Regions:
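Substrate-binding clefts and catalytic carboxylate motifs of secreted carbohydrate-active enzymes
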Residues: 35-39, 63, 84, 101-202
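Active-site mouth of glycoside hydrolases
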Residues: 1-97, 125-129, 141
């Protein structure tokens, strides 16, 4: 279960208070739900509009979550910057699957993770040998209807077949990597400003 917090101002005491109350309520409410396989209180808490990620808050919320539910793994903040986490998750939207595959080969051969957030921020993002989860990938630009403005990563595909080929290449690269524990493709459906799904709302 990932909680909505993107763009939250960590300098605002009211925002923090509201977030913590909502998170505690969600964990206590959903603890016994069989669909919950893990917890993730934050998403992409990189430095935003000059606001540095608030590591102390992330660590505190992680520790509360683990104290309340020690039976499930907890990802502290999805994508970055990890502070303390049970699973090291990655967001990678590179569209060329050969490059995508090669960048994770050292995970199998040497137990080392080579991913852009870690490499661009070695002092802030650290890999400690945790299981690796590709929690966001894809985002392939696909314009099924030219009257709507599409958005996505990589060179846009022209046909459904081309989109499926790229999807398969990226997904196979993850499945074939024995050190990846799972994946979540984003996304199969158009959502709001991200008009790059294979399917539309209707």
């Amino acid at each position: 279960s990932e909680h909505g917090n993107w763009g939250m101002d960590y300098r605002d005491a009211v925002s923090c208070e509201n977030f913590i109350n909502e998170w505690v309520e969600a964990v206590e409410r959903d603890f016994n739900h069989p669909a919950i396989i893990g917890w993730c209180p934050f998403n992409e808490t990189w430095d935003y509009k000059g606001r540095r990620q608030y590591d102390a808050l992330i660590k505190t919320v992680y520790e509360y979550t683990k104290e309340f539910d020690h039976t499930r793994p907890c990802i502290d903040t999805s994508g970055n910057f990890h502070v303390v986490t049970d699973i090291y998750d990655v967001h990678d939207y590179r569209g060329e699957f050969d490059e995508f595959r090669k960048s994770y080969e050292r995970l199998v051969t040497h137990g080392e993770l080579y991913e852009h957030v870690l490499n661009d921020n070695p002092g802030r993002q650290k890999y400690g040998g945790e299981p690796v989860f590709m929690s966001e990938y894809g985002g392939i630009k696909w314009e099924s209807d030219k009257q709507y403005k599409s958005w996505g990563y990589g060179n846009d595909v022209k046909t459904e077949e081309e989109l499926l080929e790229r999807y398969k290449g990226l997904t196979d690269a993850i499945i074939d990597n024995e050190r990846m524990l799972g994946f979540c493709y984003t996304q199969l459906y158009d959502v709001e400003q991200e008009q790059n799904g294979l399917y539309t709302y209707d």
